[in-house]
């Protein structure tokens, strides 16, 4: 059984009911289905393949080689000593065989080995109808050829074209030296249909460590790497808000490029939810349609739904199209019902249809966009304005005019709307002309631009102003810098040191913008590149005035042989010659002489350790506005120890958080993962997670406990369990993606 791959949908963990009903193999389109942990051969007959390669499967002739042969009676021959029988791609090996020529039947009573395209086996007793390709073998050990798996059977019946039938079967994917294995599937009757890639078992039990986990009268499982329809592994978890949470997905392999999954999800405190997902891949693109429906929530007493549709396509060279639509029935949906971390921390659901062009000279972008608020902590807040539609165009790079002269153009047209609020249209364009001198050791880029923004407001009442306000501002800038480098030796190692001082002057005259609405403009997070922006805002509703000089210097120490960075550091400062008035709510203005200071540093202590520090400093307040400090040690992909600190005082809700994360193998089989996210400002744990994973050759178990803040005064917690039986079930990427997120950490920290 193989569960779905690359489906970061939900992290409900699976319980130990690994083979509850039937099991489907569903990798992503075009991907392999399953790979077993390498720790010992499952098929000991693999070494015979080179010595006895199979022939043409369509060749029905029978070839027999033996050291000795004798005719015991009329029509009956006896062959002894390394007997080899070949028919098509099937080879039969035995120390002794009897051949009944009248019926074309070969029979042996000790040490039989059969090698075929689909199934290898060893048996004590066997008969093979050579001309028909039918066989019956008793007291047999069998090994799948197209998928990891082996087992024993009291009887194996094979046919040339039809399925193989096995009686009193024990099947496992554990290595051959483990006997029955740590786990096995026990069934009275098993049918292996290699044409469909499916095995079916009747009166079956899944036994783990000698303990029967589940009994089912019928079970389907994959015997090749091809996808197949059937039940996926169940997922099970528990939380305060949902109680016991059990899901049993059914996978429908419609076609190679289309599939669907239907999932009943039982929550003891909420009721029965139905989930469905349809995926497709074709010439017009690929997409996913997803739905959740919970009739009559037992706590709220109302129906609750989720719809999601995503589509991506490349309709022509250099063009891309995208549709992304999601909708829920109420603002509390993800808090109450979702166990996917990125969903439960979402503020808005986005709905958009977009078309983009990226050519050698121009970029074009068309979009219609809407949002739905899904964060209960912001209940009552207005949603972002709709963009219905938005059209943008810009030159990809400055385009040549004459000599060193270049020009650039950026334009945007957008219509904003929001229920109960004013609507309007905005046209924004900026044309710049400049020069670019770059001689390697220095550069100079003077630029003169003019930015014009025009509005047409459908409902300007809230402003008590005109219906068509506008703003026009020239923008003058000069960006210059020097580049130095030198070779240095330290501790007998060669290094390359770089030094890059930079000077950036910006002048933008002040304009009265009080008549202009604020549709989508905000102050961004500050970083080094923001020192050289011509506007301190993101969005066209506000253009900041400026008469300022940015001085900055960057330096790096790089490995002289590989060029890999060892230490990087940057200092930057904005000195203002004129005051800048606040243009957004909750924004503070800047006076003459006020400065913005930024420092960044990163150290790479070998290939395993990275330290990063960033601070934005306010001279006037003598305090940090933003600050980030982080140290990460990661010698291998699954080994990580990290600590991060973050401070932001420029937000409507300031934050100060510390984040500790780690993942480490305790033994080759046992690994632990944990994360602790703490708010220093609120003196509160935001999220605590501890998980362990034990992984052997053919099975793995993951256990995790999580406690997290849903709202400032509401905490949820849960315990999650997932069992993986290799070959019968990799139980989705539910709890695994949950643990991966904790291991990787969140560098940006919400």
Q: PLM features: what roles do these ranges have?
A:
Residues 35-37, 65, 113, 119-138, ...:
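Outer-membrane beta-barrel proteins and related beta-barrel translocases across Gram-negative bacteria
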Residues 47-59, 64-66, 80-96, 109-120, ...:
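Interaction modules related to DNA damage response and DNA replication/repair
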Residues 14-25:
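Bacterial N-terminal signal peptides
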Residues 98-99, 106:
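A low-complexity, Ser/Thr/Gly/Pro-enriched, surface-exposed linker/loop concept
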Residues 30-56:
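Compositionally biased, proline/threonine/alanine/serine-rich low-complexity intrinsically disordered stretches
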């Amino acid at each position: 059984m193989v569960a779905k791959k690359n489906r970061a949908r939900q992290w409900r963990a699976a319980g130990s009911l690994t083979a509850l009903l039937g099991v489907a193999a569903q990798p992503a389109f075009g991907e392999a289905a399953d790979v077993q942990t390498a720790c010992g051969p499952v098929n000991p007959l693999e070494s015979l393949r080179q010595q006895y390669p199979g022939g043409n499967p369509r060749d029905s002739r029978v070839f027999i080689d033996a050291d000795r042969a004798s005719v015991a009676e009329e029509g009956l021959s006896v062959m002894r000593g390394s007997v080899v029988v070949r028919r098509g791609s099937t080879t039969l090996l035995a120390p002794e065989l009897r051949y009944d020529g009248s019926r074309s039947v070969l029979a042996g009573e000790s040490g039989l080995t059969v090698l075929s395209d689909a199934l290898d086996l060893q048996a004590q007793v066997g008969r093979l109808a050579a001309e028909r390709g039918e066989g019956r073998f008793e007291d047999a050990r069998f090994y799948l050829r197209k998928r990891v798996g082996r087992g024993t059977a009291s009887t194996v019946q094979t046919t040339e074209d039809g399925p193989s039938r096995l009686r009193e079967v024990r099947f496992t994917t554990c290595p051959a030296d483990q006997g029955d294995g740590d786990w096995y599937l026990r069934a009275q009757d098993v049918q292996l249909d290699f044409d469909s890639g499916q095995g079916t078992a009747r009166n079956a039990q899944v036994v783990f460590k000698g303990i029967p986990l589940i009994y089912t009268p019928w079970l389907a499982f994959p015997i090749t790497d091809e996808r197949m329809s059937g039940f996926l592994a169940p997922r099970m978890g528990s939380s305060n808000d949902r109680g016991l949470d059990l899901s049993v997905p059914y996978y429908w392999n419609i076609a190679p490029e289309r599939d669907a999954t239907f999932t009943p999800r039982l929550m003891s405190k909420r009721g029965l939810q139905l989930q469905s997902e349809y995926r497709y891949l074709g010439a017009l693109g690929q997409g996913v349609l997803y739905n959740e429906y919970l009739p009559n929530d037992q706590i709220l007493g109302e129906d609750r739904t989720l719809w999601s549709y995503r589509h991506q396509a490349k309709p022509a060279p250099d063009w891309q199209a995208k549709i992304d639509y999601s909708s829920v029935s109420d603002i509390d949906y993800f808090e109450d019902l979702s166990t996917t971390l990125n969903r439960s921390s979402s503020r808005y659901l986005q709905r958009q249809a977009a078309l983009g062009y990226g050519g050698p000279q121009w970029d074009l972008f068309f979009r219609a966009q809407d949002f739905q608020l899904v964060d209960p902590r912001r209940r009552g807040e207005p949603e972002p304005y709709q963009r219905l539609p938005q059209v943008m165009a810009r030159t990809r790079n400055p385009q040549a005019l004459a000599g060193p002269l270049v020009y650039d153009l950026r334009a945007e047209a957008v219509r904003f709307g929001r229920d109960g609020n004013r609507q309007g249209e905005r046209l924004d364009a900026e044309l710049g002309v400049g020069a670019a001198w770059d001689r390697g050791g220095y550069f100079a880029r003077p630029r003169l631009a003019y930015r014009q923004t025009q509005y047409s407001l459908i409902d300007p009442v809230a402003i008590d102003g005109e219906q068509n306000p506008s703003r026009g501002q020239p923008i003058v800038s000069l960006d210059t810098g020097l580049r130095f480098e030198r070779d240095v030796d330290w501790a007998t190692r060669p290094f390359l040191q770089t030094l890059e001082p930079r000077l950036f002057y910006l002048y933008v005259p002040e304009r009265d913008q009080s008549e202009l609405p604020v549709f989508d403009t905000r102050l961004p997070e500050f970083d080094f590149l923001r020192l050289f922006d011509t506007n301190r805002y993101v969005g066209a509703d506000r253009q900041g005035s400026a008469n300022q000089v940015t001085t900055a210097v960057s330096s790096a120490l790089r490995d002289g042989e590989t060029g890999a960075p060892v230490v990087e550091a940057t200092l930057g400062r904005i000195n203002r010659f004129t005051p800048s008035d606040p243009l957004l709510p909750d924004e503070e203005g800047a006076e003459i002489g006020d400065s913005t200071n930024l420092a960044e540093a990163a150290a790479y202590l070998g290939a395993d350790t990275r330290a990063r520090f960033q601070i934005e400093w306010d001279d006037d307040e003598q305090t940090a506005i933003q600050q980030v400090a982080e140290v990460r040690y990661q010698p291998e992909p699954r080994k990580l120890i990290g600590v991060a600190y973050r401070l932001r005082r420029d937000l409507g809700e300031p934050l100060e958080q510390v984040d500790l994360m780690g993942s480490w193998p305790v033994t080759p089989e046992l690994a632990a993962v944990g994360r602790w996210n703490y708010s220093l400002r609120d003196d509160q744990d935001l999220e605590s997670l501890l998980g362990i994973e034990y992984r052997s050759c053919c099975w793995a178990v993951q256990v995790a406990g999580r406690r997290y803040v849903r709202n400032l005064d509401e905490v949820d917690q849960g315990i999650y369990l997932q069992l993986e039986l290799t070959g019968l079930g990799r139980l989705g990427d539910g709890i695994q993606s949950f643990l991966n997120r904790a291991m990787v950490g969140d560098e940006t920290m919400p």
